Each structure stands twice: as C-alpha cells, then as structure tokens.
Regions:
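Short, solvent-exposed aromatic-acidic interface loops
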Residues: 11-13, 31-36, 53-58, 90-96
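Tryptophan-anchored aromatic micro-motifs
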Residues: 1-14, 87-89
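Short secondary-structure capping micro-motifs at structural edges
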Residues: 24-28, 37-38
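Short, compositionally biased strand/turn segments
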Residues: 14-25
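Solvent-exposed residues in well-ordered beta-strands and their adjoining turns
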Residues: 9-11, 53-55, 81, 104-106
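Contiguous, well-ordered beta-strand patches that form the walls/edges
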Residues: 34-84
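Short hydrophobic/aromatic-rich beta-strand segments that constitute the beta-sheet cores
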Residues: 8, 28-31, 48-52, 85-89
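Edge beta-strand at a domain terminus
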Residues: 18, 43-45, 84-86, 91-108
Length: 108
C-alpha cells in the first residue's frame, strides 16, 4: 500500500459512508464529519491486512453510525489495483456483518 492520502468509501447492509485516510509507516489515520478512524496496516504477500477502530468525535445525532454503535473495530484484508485498494472484512463486535471498503489514493 502506497503511503499517502486516500478517500475511502465503505459499505454494509445498513448503508454506505465515506471519509479520508492517511497511510504512513504502517499507520492509518483519518475520519469523516462524525468519526475518527485510527488503525494499522501490514502487507502479507499480495494482501494488505488492516485493523482499524472508529471513535465518535461529533455528538450531533444526525451522524448515524453504520454499525449502530459509536466505537467499532474492523479487521480487513485487501488487494491493490493501481491507486485503489479493495478491502473486505468484519467488525469484531458484529462478526456476521460483512463490511467492504474501497480506498482510492488522492495525494501524497
């Protein structure tokens, strides 16, 4: 995974969302208007493995969490395709609920 700034689009059966992530030295940091995203990534062969958590920073009830809770930890596996990375995984708190994310690199 290239270091840099990514836009992220994520999907569950409950809805979709988006935000930004910055990848550097194995760390992921970012968020959107309602939540911060804090995690780590490693490369294992052709796959990228991610563990990332959400933390609500905006108490406005208009910002609804996709998983129904303000704090969640996701475990994801992904593959690169040029400037994009496709991830699939689940939340530790809801292991049966599929999660998909597409990261697209938008800058250094």
């Amino acid at each position: 995974m290239q270091e840099g700034l990514y836009k992220v689009e994520f999907h569950t059966v409950h809805g979709t969302g988006n935000g930004v992530l910055y990848a550097t030295s194995g760390k992921l940091r970012g968020g959107n208007s309602g939540f911060a995203f804090i995690g780590n990534y490693t490369r294992k062969g052709d796959e990228i493995h991610v563990k990332i958590s959400t933390l609500r920073h905006n108490l406005d009830p208009g910002f609804k969490p996709l998983f129904g809770t303000d704090m969640i930890t996701l475990t994801l596996k992904g593959t690169e395709n040029g400037d994009m990375v496709d991830f699939e995984g689940t939340a530790l708190q809801m292991p049966g609920l599929a999660f998909r994310a597409v990261l697209t690199r938008i800058g250094d």
